Amino acid sequence: MKKRLTITLSESVLENLEKMAREMGLSKSAMISVALENYKKGQEK
């Protein structure tokens, strides 16, 4: 089940998020999910 979350980002972080999401063909929400999953995998090593 998906839940809604509201976050506050600096302009530069938001611009980077939008650019990365656009380049990968993902929504901002999906981009954040991918980034968190990748971070989690990196921490497990």
Curated annotation (Swiss-Prot):
The keyword ATP-binding is annotated on this UniProt entry: no
Induction, per UniProt: Represses its own synthesis.
Claim: DNA-binding is one of the keywords in the record: yes
DNA-binding region: 16-36
Gene Ontology CC: protein-DNA complex
Gene Ontology terms describing biological process: plasmid maintenance; regulation of DNA-templated transcription
InterPro entries: Arc_rbn_hlx_hlx, CopG, Ribbon_hlx_hlx
Annotated consequence of substituting A30E: 5-fold increase in plasmid copy number
Keywords assigned: DNA-binding, Plasmid, Plasmid copy control, Repressor, Transcription, Transcription regulation
Pfam families: RHH_1
SUPFAM superfamilies associated with the record: Ribbon-helix-helix
Gene3D superfamilies, alphabetized: Met repressor-like (1.10.1220.10)
Membership in a protein family: Belongs to the transcriptional regulatory CopG/NikR family.
Subunit structure: Homodimer.
Function: Regulates the plasmid copy number. Binds to the repAB promoter thus controlling the synthesis of the plasmid replication initiator protein RepB.
Protein name per the record: Protein CopG
